[in-house]
Amino acid sequence: MKYNQYAYVETSPEKATEELLAINFLPENYSSLSFSELLAVLTGNVLAEATTRQAKDAKLAEFAVDDQTDLAAFLLDTPTAITASQFANVALQLLGYHPNYDYSLTDPLTCGEKHALPAFKDLTSKEELIFAFYRLLNTRSKNGQILLDVMAGKGYFTQFWGEGKFMLFNGKSLPVFDTSQVIREVVYVQSDLDTDGDGKGDLLPVTIFRPVESQDQLKVPALYTASPYFGGIIDNVKTNHNVDENLTDATTWTNPKYVAKPLVKSPAPSGQDVPATELATGQSSYGLNEYLLARGFASVFSGAIGNRHGDGIRITGSPEETISQKEVIEWLTGDRVAYTDRTRRFETKASWCSGNVGMTGRSYLGTLQIAIATTGVKGLKTVVSEAAISSWYDYYREHGLVIAPSECQGEDMDKLAEVCQSNLWDGGNFTAKKAYEAEQAELLAAQDRATGQYSDFWESRNYRHHADGIKCSWISVHGLNDWNVKPKNVYKIWQKVKQLPVESHLFLHQGPHYNMNNLVSIDFTDLMNLWFVHELLEVENGAYEQWPKVMIQDNLEADKWHAESDWANDLGQASLYSPTADGYLSTVENGTGQLTFTDLGGTEFKKAGISETDWEYQFISGEKKWAKASLRFESEEFLHPTTLVGRPKVQVRVAANKTVGQLSVALVDLGTRQRLTATPKIFARGNQPFGYRFEADSLQEFVPDKATKAKLITKAHMNLQNYQDMKQPSKLEAGQFVDLEFELQPTYYTLPAGAKLCLIIYSTDQGMTKRPLETEDYTVDLAGTALLLYRK
């Protein structure tokens, strides 16, 4: 598998020598050393676990230069050069590869090529040797980290602990901060909000992990993770809403309104600055933050309103939620008051903070980055938003229907608020409990699970309509197989952000609702190190030009990434397909006639007792038990690999035999073959240290799985009563044909030669839609039905 490397910054030999000297890797007297002496010293310096020169020299015999000679013996002959093969053998062993197991000592260059390592060459001078080691230190090891990070995990950089300054190498920050003495503290930011109605501004607990070096003169930037889960998660899955119910006439919709909560203006910060008096007992919950904490970036967490030990109530997705999370940044930049404890007597300042703030986090944590960025708050320099919601309607609804996130059937705004209302665990917080119960009733009514229609309530939770307020640089990360936060969320915010005068990048991986910072196929963590150094330390390191604007992981070969200028329909050519009465999906023949299927609702699914995931696979694979409740149309086999891009669109002329109805459409890749695993395989658990005796991550990647019959590419759902307007339901008569036109979730998917594309038209999606208790007939007029794709 290829260890692709995008974060290595091309560096001159002169600059490389300077950087090697700065980290004490290249000895000051290197010019007086012979080639063989320098080779011994540099190899020994990689072995950070050996703390004396004698110990380092003793370990040289453990390394082979070929299948006959160890390095110590090789050096006895005082060589003045080393061949590409010999150096490759030593380098591969330093990188963690095992000779005779991972590769052959007689052919190390093939191993390097296999894993996309930098090319090895003959080294005939000390200058070449020095630069070769510089490149080696910046090369990804078998554990996925660059060799310099492996050395850090063995204690190499403890020699710099206490110096109180950032050190850079190849444009990235080094782990020179003492992780054994991290300051862990809690402060209470006062909000302008009074969401619990007690007449006082809500206090928002904020947890800070920062380098001990920031106690003195060093000011450090902050990585802020707005995490509603940080205070704890209330498990309420057993109380999720019932979805086994019939559809409701959507014309009963009343357009529920958003109602703002009262404000209580907080006092301006005074000159008082008392050190924090509460120790943090919570743990960092985001690996990228831990990695960068060892490299000098403070890590800040807050769940804001409604979180454990704080005030207020959770109001999922609301402007109040955005305001409260934004207020933490205002404290970090000196514009808001915070206190040492809940008595509000002693102010404390983020005097350790440089005023430059970046944001990190996935899912809800990524969502709040989008929300805060739209406010244009001062000090927020960049966001790295992963698997984020850009409109809450697109999370819990779709085209006039109640639609669940994957594996979250019955969840909704009120239930998520309950999950995150961790201050309910504070037994004495009676104010929050009373306000919470009232808010739950309001959320239940306003979210309108009866009709699923767009409303003012949902409009207030659509961050995309405030995208013009974004002033910071932007990175979005999303899984193309994320059916929790569906890809529409990142696609639609990307269409806005890419037009703004800010630097922006997009990563699309093959995962579901997953992080990508520890994949074999891409050095994402190193890229983010480079990025945050540029944005928060304000060092010009070429980060903006270092990698393509859009990077997309291939669905056939996990170690292949596509460089694109954009992610949009424009990447491909439009192709129109028509379903025909004999079950074909044709580009040359128009469909005629009518076909009918009977939707069974959720009754058979409940009887089967299988999971929603198992149902979906059996359904898309065409198992008769489930496929009979659908219409399926298959293309001819593709003669050449074909990549689908952007958002497919369907037009369906359909009639139902009831006055309500829901239509689902799926695009499926058919053909029995190996496909990538749904989630990455862990190669070695806990093998990526973030620093010396600190936290760690695990190397993982998608790998070929057992053969399957089919794979879902994309899908979408629509309420038949929105045939005239996506935001306004209309009356529907039984038997009335209506023309539905809607887009599917966006994709970037390659169909290999020999695959077939299958269009499935159905109604009940057991994992996402409501599951009616009654059957319903749907008749599709093929003459008014078509599929528009964009193909590369």
UniProtKB/Swiss-Prot annotation:
Cited Pfam families: Peptidase_S15 (PF02129), PepX_C (PF08530), PepX_N (PF09168)
Gene3D superfamilies membership: 1.10.246.70, alpha/beta hydrolase, Galactose-binding domain-like
Keywords in alphabetical order: Aminopeptidase, Cytoplasm, Hydrolase, Protease, Serine protease
Keyword Cytoplasm: yes
Source organism: Lactobacillus delbrueckii subsp. bulgaricus (strain ATCC BAA-365 / Lb-18)
Annotated compartments: Cytoplasm
Function according to Swiss-Prot or TrEMBL: Removes N-terminal dipeptides sequentially from polypeptides having unsubstituted N-termini provided that the penultimate residue is proline.
Family: Belongs to the peptidase S15 family.
Originating gene: pepX
Annotated catalysed reactions: Hydrolyzes Xaa-Pro-|- bonds to release unblocked, N-terminal dipeptides from substrates including Ala-Pro-|-p-nitroanilide and (sequentially) Tyr-Pro-|-Phe-Pro-|-Gly-Pro-|-Ile
Disulphide-bridged cysteine pairs: none
Annotated active site: 363, 482, 513
Assembly and interaction partners: Homodimer.
Primary enzyme class: hydrolase
Protein name in UniProt: Xaa-Pro dipeptidyl-peptidase
GO cellular component terms, A-Z: cytoplasm
E.C. numbers: 3.4.14.11
Stored HAMAP family: Aminopeptidase_S15
Keyword Acetylation: no
GO MF entries: aminopeptidase activity; dipeptidyl-peptidase activity; serine-type peptidase activity
Main location class: cytoplasm
Biological process according to GO: proteolysis
